Amino acid sequence: MTTPRPIYIGCDPAFRAGGFWAAILDMEDKTIRFMSFDLLSWHDFLRSADAPPSCFICVENSNLQNKSFDMTGTKAEIARKGRNVGCNQAVSELAYRSAVLQYGARNVFQVSPKEKGVKITDTRVFFGIMKQEGILLPPGATNQDQRDAAKLALICQRKALLEGRFKADKVPQIRYNPAP
């Protein structure tokens, strides 16, 4: 029996007018597609017929870092930035919890912004990484949020494989008999 190739979803939640992006990496055909969500549509998608019945998800959870990044500006600007950070932390935590409720803690990872690492700002570098991984991108340009989500999907793949959460096909055991 062959185990179907896994699906990895990278989710970079944010609280903003345009919502946030998720990258869905399907290892069956090595394609990636991008979908835009707000928190409620993310929750609904995970429970819909359009969502994969089984997958691994990696959510960037800024709540893990619990830090305001930019403390420059007037008191009012700092307060506004603090509220924005708080909103993003709440959305991140709820997006993570929603995924865990649907797929279970074993299939859902969370990483802090620090653990996610630097952004891939150069599209040529991004396309090079995808080519190196053998992943087919949809036609057209990508934005920074899509590239971040794709990076999270790749992190998800590594974490699932390294932590042994994906059950690969059993390799038949070969017994060596040295006797003639």
Walk through the language-model features, giving the residues of each.
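Phosphate- and other anionic-substrate recognition elements at nucleic-acid/protein interfaces
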Residues: T2-P180
